[in-house]
C-alpha cells in the first residue's frame, strides 16, 4: 500500500524580529562579559538569518507594551518572566498557529473535508496545556468528535518525523485512514540573556511557526500528491547525549546545544542512511 503526503502548509505569527536589531539588544545587556558580548555578535551574525517571526510582540524595537514582560524598551533590558507566564502565552498563541496551519492544510487538499480526518497528531516541545492543541483543532475545524487524537510532546525539533511515521503506519493499517499532522513551536517564548554559549545560540537561531500535513493512502482525485512516504529509519548515536538537550527551568525552558553536534552527525549520518538506501 502506498501512502502519500497530500498537502503541506505553514503558519507564522505576524510580528517580525529583525536580526540586527535583536543582536544589538542582546549585545547591550548589562550582565554580559566582554566574551559574552562577542559571542552574541558572532552567533547572531553567523546565523545567516535576516528576520524571524515571533509570537512575542514586545520583543520588537518599537514595542509599546504598557507592562512589558520580555523586553522593556524604556531601559533596553531583556526581562526574565517565569515559566508560568511564558507557558500561558504559549497556550494562547500556539493555539492560533495550530488551528491556522491545520485549516490551511485542509483547504489545500481538495477531496478531503474536515469530517474525513480519522487521526490527528499534534507535535510541540515549547509548551504545554490541557485540553491541548488536539482538542482545540477538533473544535475549531469541526472534525469528527470520534477522531483518534495523539500528541508528541517534548521530543524536540525532529518530532515531525516520528509523527509522519506514525501517520504512515495508521494509513497502512487502515486503507480509509486520513491523518492530519500539525506541529507548532514558539521558541521565542524562551529567549533570555546569558553568557552561556548554548543559550546565546538558541536566542540567535530559533523562532515561531507551525506546519500541517495531510497523509492518506486513499485515492483522491485532483492535484497529484506532494510526496510518497516510502520508508522511515531512526538510530541512536553512541555519543551526544550531553551535547543537545531541552530542560524546564524556573525562567523558561533551557537549551543545551553544543558546537560538537555537527561533528556527531557527520560521524554517524552514513550509518543512519544506509537502511534507507539499501
Task: Tell what function each PLM region has.
Residues 1-89, 178, 187, 193-267, ...:
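Condensing-enzyme catalytic core mediating Claisen C-C bond formation in acyl metabolism
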Residues 42-43, 105, 137, 276:
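Residues within well-ordered alpha helices
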Residues 92, 99-116, 125-249:
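Acyl-thioester C-C bond-transforming condensing/cleaving domain
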Residues 95-102, 265-266, 270:
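Hydrophobic faces of stable alpha-helices that mediate helix-helix packing
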Amino acid at each position: 500500500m502506498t501512502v502519500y503526503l497530500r498537502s503541506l502548509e505553514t503558519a507564522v505569527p505576524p510580528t517580525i524580529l529583525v536580526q540586527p536589531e535583536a543582536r544589538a539588544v542582546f549585545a547591550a545587556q548589562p550582565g554580559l562579559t566582554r566574551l559574552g558580548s562577542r559571542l552574541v555578535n558572532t552567533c547572531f551574525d553567523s546565523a545567516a538569518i535576516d528576520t524571524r517571526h515571533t509570537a512575542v510582540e514586545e520583543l520588537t524595537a518599537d514595542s509599546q507594551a504598557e507592562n512589558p514582560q520580555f523586553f522593556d524598551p524604556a531601559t533596553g533590558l531583556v526581562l526574565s518572566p517565569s515559566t508560568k507566564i511564558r507557558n500561558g502565552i504559549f497556550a494562547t498563541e500556539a493555539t492560533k498557529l495550530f488551528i491556522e496551519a491545520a485549516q490551511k492544510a485542509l483547504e489545500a487538499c481538495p477531496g478531503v473535508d474536515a469530517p474525513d480526518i480519522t487521526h490527528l497528531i499534534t507535535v510541540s516541545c515549547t509548551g504545554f496545556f490541557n485540553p491541548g492543541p488536539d482538542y482545540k483543532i477538533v473544535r475549531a475545524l469541526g472534525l469528527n468528535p470520534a477522531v483518534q487524537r495523539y500528541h508528541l510532546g517534548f521530543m524536540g525539533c525532529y518530532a515531525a518525523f516520528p509523527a509522519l511515521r506514525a501517520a504512515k503506519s495508521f494509513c497502512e493499517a487502515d486503507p480509509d485512514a486520513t491523518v492530519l499532522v500539525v506541529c507548532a513551536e514558539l521558541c521565542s517564548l524562551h529567549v533570555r540573556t546569558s553568557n552561556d554559549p548554548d543559550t546565546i545560540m538558541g536566542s540567535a537561531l530559533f523562532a515561531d511557526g507551525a506546519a500541517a500535513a495531510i497523509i492518506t493512502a486513499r485515492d483522491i482525485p485532483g492535484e497529484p500528491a506532494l510526496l510518497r512516504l516510502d520508508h522511515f529509519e531512526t538510530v541512536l548515536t553512541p555519543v551526544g547525549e550531553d551535547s543537545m538537550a531541552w530542560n524546564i527551568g524556573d525562567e523558561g525552558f533551557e537549551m543545551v546545544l553544543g558546537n560538537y553536534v555537527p561533528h556527531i552527525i557527520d560521524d554517524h549520518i552514513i550509518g543512519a542512511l544506509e537502511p534507507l538506501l539499501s
